[in-house]
Amino acid sequence: SAKREIANAFLVTDDDIIISDPEAEYSPLVERLGGQVIRVSPTSTQYINPMDINMNYSEEDNPIALKADFILSLCELVVGGKEGLQPIEKTVIDRCVHQVYQSYFNDPRPDNMPVLEDLYDELMKQDEKEAHHVATALEIYVKGSLNLFNHRTNVDIDNRLVCYDIKELGKQLKKIGMLIVQDQVWGRVTANREEGKSTRYYMDEMHLLLREDQTAAYSVEIWKRFRKWGGIP
């Protein structure tokens, strides 16, 4: 079973192990092994920041371009509806993502790490009505009752064994949570690659991320990179 495989990998290898856990079934094992369980829910005070980025985020010289792809996928889940994002919406999101990270990379300290609200504010400054449409759709995730992803990361995501318990996320939030966890895993893979370390990722219900075009394309691309960079799915 997956639990036995995880326990063996933990005891026999030095690999980092990350679990996306939609049914809260891995928490007892992870706690027994001294790992970190992160409960992602609208009522939790444990936060992961979807805007987290590190200098090694992409193998090309431009980590912002790959991060923009992730943010576009996130916005597709939030804004897209059946039609997905429209071309002008994609353009303004991409522009704003570049502006937000440009100012971060000018002074890349942890307390300058952008949050969703920085993207929201940047969208509101744009002239296009499409930018305001996207910002309005994001508002509930920034200032409203679903603002759990509008905080800086405040948990130990560097533990060798991390389990993201997303059971309490509702149907719509679950996909968003899975996408954000996938991005956190990618951040870990890129950091570990620098140290020559492998990263194992266990993920249930992957099919949920393959239903929207942009999100599916992004997820497939990330999984290809993941394997190339020493990830073990």
Please report, for each region that a protein language model flagged, where it lies by residue:
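Glycine-rich phosphate-binding loop of nucleotide-binding enzymes
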Residues: S1-P42
